[in-house]
A protein has these predicted regions:
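Short glycine-rich or small-residue beta-strand-to-loop segments that form or flank ligand, phosphate
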Residues: 17-22, 47-50, 76-79
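Short beta->alpha junction loops
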Residues: 48-58
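Glycine-rich phosphate/diphosphate-binding loop of Rossmann-like nucleotide-binding domains
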Residues: 18-38
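Single conserved hydrophobic/aromatic residue that forms the stacking wall/gate
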Residues: 1-6, 10
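Carboxylate- and glycine-rich phosphate/diphosphate-binding segment that chelates Mg2+/Mn2+
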Residues: 136-208
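Glycine/threonine-rich beta-strand-loop-alpha-helix active-site module
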Residues: 59-162
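Predominant activation on well-ordered alpha-helical scaffold segments within soluble catalytic domains
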Residues: 33-36, 47, 62-65, 89-92, ...
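Nucleotide donor/acceptor-binding cores
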Residues: 14-17, 118
Length: 208
């Protein structure tokens, strides 16, 4: 799946990719090195933004966006769990619109059109958040002690890779936590006031 993702990125005329990752599991299990190798093999220049913390902060988003402005990628690739993918989504907005404030980013469905500078690929290593296919991102302002949702279809990834090889590296505790997270999302979908005849059977099947 990783090699096909690199090929897909290259076919979309990608020349420079920034990979955003978290605390080290992607590197420890060799997936980060594989992704870098596949992208370089496809003729792309690659730069890393590492160390994205769980529940990513506003400060991390701003640092990542600054790194993107310097490197000028045409592809942003987020690898790992929900945190690096959420952080990279927010960095993407700030990269495309350097003048935008965090407060403006948090206006629901208020993000201006993206993809002027870069497209987005999410490679998920966990089963819980499904942020690789959603229009949402959660960023924490630790000074205020508040988690802010960013909600806009503009930040839905262009490419989502769900490779079982990555999920197999999860420790048992994380498997349990993300499994409950996935079930919670299924229950939320079923009881949501925005449900419909199409989503209800999917939600029930997911719960089972």
């Amino acid at each position: 799946a990783l090699s096909s993702a690199a090929s897909d990125v290259y076919k979309r005329q990608g020349k420079k990719a920034m990979i955003c990752v978290g605390g080290g599991s992607m590197k420890r299990f060799g997936f980060l090195d594989r992704a870098v190798a596949y992208l370089k093999e496809a003729g792309m220049e690659v730069e890393l933004f590492e160390g994205i913390e769980p529940d990513p902060s506003v400060e991390t988003v701003m640092r990542g966006a600054e790194a993107m402005l310097k490197f000028e990628p045409d592809w942003i690739i987020a690898m790992g769990g929900g945190s690096p993918i959420d952080a990279a989504k927010a960095m993407w907005i700030k990269y495309e619109y350097p003048e935008i404030t965090f407060e403006e980013m948090c206006k629901v469905f208020g993000i201006p059109p993206l993809r002027r500078k870069a497209h987005f690929c999410a490679i998920s290593s966990t089963s819980g958040t499904a942020t690789e296919v959603t229009a949402f991102s959660i960023i924490t302002d630790y000074q205020k002690g508040i988690k802010y949702p960013i909600a806009d279809f503009e930040i839905t990834p262009d490419v989502a890779i769900v490779d079982p090889d990555l999920a197999e590296t999860m420790p048992k505790k994380l498997v349990a936590h993300t499994g409950m997270d996935a079930m919670t999302h299924a229950i939320e979908a079923y009881v949501s006031t925005a449900n419909c005849d199409f989503t209800d059977p999917l939600a029930l099947h997911a719960i089972k």
